[in-house]
Design a protein with these regions (language model features):
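Glycine- and other small-residue-rich loops at beta-strand/loop junctions that grip anionic moieties
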Residues: 24-27, 48-51, 73, 100
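A conserved C-terminal secondary-structure "cap"
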Residues: 81, 98-102
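Short beta-strand/loop segments at the ligand-binding rim of alpha/beta enzyme cores
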Residues: 40-50
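Short beta-alpha connecting loops at secondary-structure transitions
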Residues: 89-98
Length: 118
């Protein structure tokens, strides 16, 4: 891996430690030892794909070890849909879109707060 990251001059490296895109059935089993081993041999910023649904304590552990970017698109999309559905009874498209955007804003803020430990 050291040869690879040096040879291709990567900007960031997405690591597979038991994470997966989409939603998890139950608590995910992340391999923090593998994450630490990767961190120990590279200075490249590490990315966690499939961050949606990973509990906060596991996110914090991943950040402590070296994760610098966390992808949570599934949760963001779900927030948008739920927001739109919550405003759908009135049938006003613009109210639905506004509710979806507000839900995305709230979800994004909660994730930023989690990632920054606020």
């Amino acid at each position: 891996m050291v040869d690879f990251t040096g040879a291709v001059q990567v900007d960031a490296l997405a690591v597979g430690i038991g994470n997966a895109h989409g939603l998890y059935k139950g608590r995910p089993n992340l391999d923090f030892q593998r994450l630490q081993e990767v961190k120990d041999v590279t200075n490249v910023p590490l990315v966690l794909h499939g961050g949606s649904g990973i509990p906060g304590d596991m996110i914090q552990t991943a950040i402590e070890i070296g994760i610098r970017k966390i992808n949570v698109a599934t949760e963001i999309r779900m927030a948008y849909v739920q927001g739109m559905l919550s405003a759908s009874a009135g049938g006003d498209y613009y109210e639905m879109v506004t509710a979806g955007k507000d839900a995305v804003r709230q979800m994004a803020k909660s994730k930023i707060d989690l990632f920054l430990r606020r």
